[in-house]
């Protein structure tokens, strides 16, 4: 993990980008053969994305809470995310096809979800204090110091 930045900073959002949440919820632990492939597929996709910046992926972080695993991803655009999702020569499409075949079995052993948000300059507010330089939206697009003109959330949003 990156060294923490000991001053207050904010994300330096210069253009539109995408926040993509994707994850899974293990509904039936003992049906390991149904949820384990989905669990194991995600890290290989993330490695592929970091190795190929031309795909438009910026960064990701994984969070676990109980039975739910969520990967928070930042992308340059919705079009880049959509293009990657449909590329048959990349890791996502084959993994999705295999998962979908298992998911239609109707056991409900694993649930999946994703949410996509378009983030535009002037419509997002961030604040980081004593956080690692690679954390969150600021880690994806870069950070800049909070100044007297950006003290409040409203000022940072503008």
Question: What spans do the regions from the language model cover?
Answer:
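Tryptophan-centric aromatic hotspots in well-structured domains and transmembrane helices
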Residues: 74-76
């Amino acid at each position: 993990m990156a060294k923490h930045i000991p001053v207050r900073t904010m994300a330096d959002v210069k253009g539109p980008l995408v926040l993509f949440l994707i994850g899974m919820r293990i509904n039936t632990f003992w049906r390991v053969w149904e949820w384990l492939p989905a669990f194991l597929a995600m890290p290989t996709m993330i490695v592929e994305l970091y190795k190929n910046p031309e795909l438009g992926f910026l960064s990701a972080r994984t969070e676990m809470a109980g039975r739910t695993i969520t990967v928070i991803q930042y992308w340059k655009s919705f079009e880049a995310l959509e293009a990657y999702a449909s590329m048959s020569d990349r890791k996502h499409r084959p993994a999705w096809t295999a998962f979908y075949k298992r998911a239609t079995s109707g056991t409900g052993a694993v649930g999946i979800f994703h949410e996509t948000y378009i983030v535009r300059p002037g419509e997002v507010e961030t604040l980081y204090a004593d956080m690692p330089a690679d954390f969150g939206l600021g880690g994806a697009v870069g950070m800049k110091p909070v100044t007297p003109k950006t003290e409040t959330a409203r000022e940072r949003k503008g």
